[in-house]
Amino acid sequence: MFGKLLTKVFGSRNDRTLKGLQKIVISINALEADYEKLTDEALKAKTAEFRERLAAGASLDSIMAEAFATVREASKRVFDMRHFDVQLLGGMVLDSNRIAEMRTGEGKTLTATLPAYLNALTGKGVHVITVNDYLARRDAENNRPLFEFLGLTVGINVAGLGQHEKKAAYNADITYGTNNEFGFDYLRDNMAFSPQERVQRPLHYALIDEVDSILIDEARTPLIISGAAEDSSELYIKINTLIPNLIRQDKEDTEEYVGEGDYSIDEKAKQVHFTERGQEKVENLLIERGMLAEGDSLYSAANISLLHHVNAALRAHTLFERDVDYIVQDNEVIIVDEHTGRTMPGRRWSEGLHQAVEAKEGVHIQNENQTLASITFQNYFRQYEKLAGMTGTADTEAFEFQHIYGLDTVVVPTNRPMVRKDMADLVYLTADEKYQAIIKDIKDCRERGQPVLVGTVSIEQSELLARLMVQEKIPHEVLNAKFHEREAEIVAQAGRTGSVTIATNMAGRGTDIVLGGNWNMEIDELDNPTAEQKAKIKADWQIRHDEVVAAGGLHILGTERHESRRIDNQLRGRAGRQGDAGSSRFYLSMEDSLMRIFASDRVSGMMKKLGMEEGEAIEHPWVSRAIENAQRKVEARNFDIRKQLLEFDDVANDQRQVVYAQRNELMDAESIEDTIQNIQDDVIGAVIDQYIPPQSVEELWDIPGLEQRLHQEFMLKLPIQEWLDKEDDLHEESLRERIITAWGDAYKAKEEMVGAQVLRQFEKAVMLQTLDGLWKEHLAAMDHLRQGIHLRGYAQKNPKQEYKRESFELFQQLLNTLKHDVISVLSKVQVQAQSDVEEMEARRREEDAKIQRDYQHAAAESLVGSSDEHEAVTAQAPMIRDGEKVGRNDPCPCGSGRKYKQCHGKLS
């Protein structure tokens, strides 16, 4: 109450921010008359003038008003479009490390030209990031004439470009591209073997379109570059045949309740668990098929790989549904993005889940992959010196943007008042009743010529509605992941009189729905249209536009509430653009996922009390509030998962930054001779310490062992025992120095034989290759550690602290192994000539060619340890169990005091 009172008196933080920026808008508008008088040449010359002022020490803020005025005037001349004042406000928000929430149709693409131009003047590069290749190409080509008029270069960074094309794109003043490509290029640059192979410049300014989609929806998806691991497709096929024998149980076993099913599903957490009965049944089935030894347990260390496959198969059959979570196309399983409804070719689920789904669908099973490099979008984008974003719906996620990325959200007012009518939800008891009501609403809209956009949450639902419309003879277009090729065309005409378009979730986002249809697209379809043809198309469009406005504008019809309010708002936001008429309504049923899982008891009770009959709907603020509270719960849970994932990934990120920085230093250095010298002293010294403990008596020295080790690992054949026998005054310190000097002399001789330049090149190649190999193994070890770390909670230990401690130990181990392996390789290898270095480089390139770029959808549960699955601890080689098999009711060996089945035995 007091908060509302204070806001009324002082205005909200958003109001105060906009008020401060409004003063700069006045300054920009004051320059307009003078800039209109400038010739084209004088206007173009402004770019060089601004660059000179920046070079002389001026700040971007000091030239902002003039730069924005320049872009506005150039836009009027090139596009015949003038930036509105609200677009100037949006541009200033984007320049100040903030997120601008701008409604659909307010011209975000044109707004982005303002901060992009201003920040490009520094010469450090601007990255404008979109969600797909189509939007990246479209925005780059649309804005290219404006930027080139002002003397700036524009690059496009999309999939399929060669190294030289990529380099050219990054060297442009402004580079448009997708988040995937920028992230993958960063990883590839950090796997390069020479500075010439790198394509990116230091990360300066990123301007993200649809920022909520990229920084929030995609935040749980790490970008992964991977290489193929061993083939285990046969095992997936065999285990796939077991799952249909299992029976689902309504709820989990407890002390009071023991069911008769084999597994239970937790729909809230999106997890599946075996019951005790199910575990025994699976073990018996595996024994029958000869995949498990008689009397052996699925949970013994030797069978962890088998357990991993069983868990993956169970999840594939119970949690992942065809035409909802994925589609099968051209004998391939392709993931469908749950947030946008788009397909994601080339992206694969990790931890063997994708292979399990392939086995379930009977398509070709691709090999599992080994991670070579990975990063989350969260950690990639936090590396930019300046970061900003724009979207139509950011306010619901403002806390997360601030908490994770340090970005404030500013809601930019619309240019014209919003007149869309958002009607209350209608809730039905069954899905059939809901669909009947939807069809009736669509028919009513068509009768009055009002276009309808029907939003669905899955491909399956969109196809069901399409079948119902065919039965009712309602002409319609379907826009889902299966028909994305026609996406822009379908969306462009979705505003025509009486048209009906079914769209999966937010498919078609980024393309405006114009009332009456898109007349620009009609003109583009003609070859060299005449002025008369253009005028006729525009006149016809105006008639259609007026008809649609009179009918009530675009009607948005939601068939189900999404887990996130933001996605619902995005669907609503397709109507009412730029002050257009429009309306929206959501139709729900008690059988919808969100209602069934989160709101069912309360709302069902309410509906029963009201004595509802078949086909009758409830429309009440209480119901809407209950649904919104359910959505808030899901949003809070998803935020916690992303936050927890980031906390874990931050540990890996610190190590990644160190390794990549060291790697770049190595690559850029002319010579790493001094580094090799320092490492050599450490490595040889550490080996000597193992056989001659520091400050120890001679009786404790193991000289034969030291001689053998130096010869085996460093090709040093030294008569150490002879030295000691002949020289009484040879003590520990001087012996140490003599051994290290002997290695140095042997290495010097090698250098004289092959030449200093060849050896310097070879040192660098060995160091980089060894580091890459060890880093790859380290990533696998970190994955295994992270995915099993939640089990430490059973031993009353903090999993996060344990993860930090153990990952640091692994990293120390990596550095020590790196030093040792580099010196060992340099000691043993006989470099004959320059050709040896070239051959090594050729082999490395061959390996590179085998690497496939992969997106792996890491299940958030396994990443942060909220799942009880232990599929993560997949062994690289079979492990032999020593000691007796632990019974399920025996005390757990970890010492927690619990039964084994309730502690470390509770793996699924």
From Swiss-Prot:
One of its GO terms (molecular function) is metal ion binding. Zn(2+) binds at C892, C894, C903, H904. May bind 1 zinc ion per subunit. The keyword Nucleus does not apply. It is found in: Cell inner membrane; Cytoplasm. Keywords: ATP-binding, Cell inner membrane, Cell membrane, Cytoplasm, Membrane, Metal-binding, Nucleotide-binding, Protein transport, Translocase, Translocation, Transport, Zinc. GO terms for cellular component: cell envelope Sec protein transport complex; cytosol; plasma membrane. HAMAP family: SecA. ATP binds at Q87, G105, E106, G107, K108, T109, D512. GO terms for biological process: intracellular protein transmembrane transport; protein import; protein targeting; protein transport by the Sec complex. It catalyses: ATP + H2O + cellular proteinSide 1 = ADP + phosphate + cellular proteinSide 2. Part of the Sec protein translocase complex. Interacts with the SecYEG preprotein conducting channel. Has a central role in coupling the hydrolysis of ATP to the transfer of proteins into and across the cell membrane, serving both as a receptor for the preprotein-SecB complex and as an ATP-driven molecular motor driving the stepwise translocation of polypeptide chains across the membrane. Residues 860-908 are annotated as: Disordered. It comes from Shewanella baltica (strain OS155 / ATCC BAA-1091). InterPro entries: Helicase_ATP-bd, Helicase_C-like, P-loop_NTPase, SEC_C_motif, SecA, SecA_CS, SecA_DEAD, SecA_motor_DEAD. This is Protein translocase subunit SecA. It is an enzyme of class 7 (translocase). PROSITE patterns: SECA (PS01312), SECA_MOTOR_DEAD (PS51196). Its cofactor is Zn(2+). Gene3D superfamilies: Helical scaffold and wing domains of SecA, P-loop containing nucleotide triphosphate hydrolases, SecA, preprotein cross-linking domain. Monomer and homodimer. Part of the essential Sec protein translocation apparatus which comprises SecA, SecYEG and auxiliary proteins SecDF-YajC and YidC.
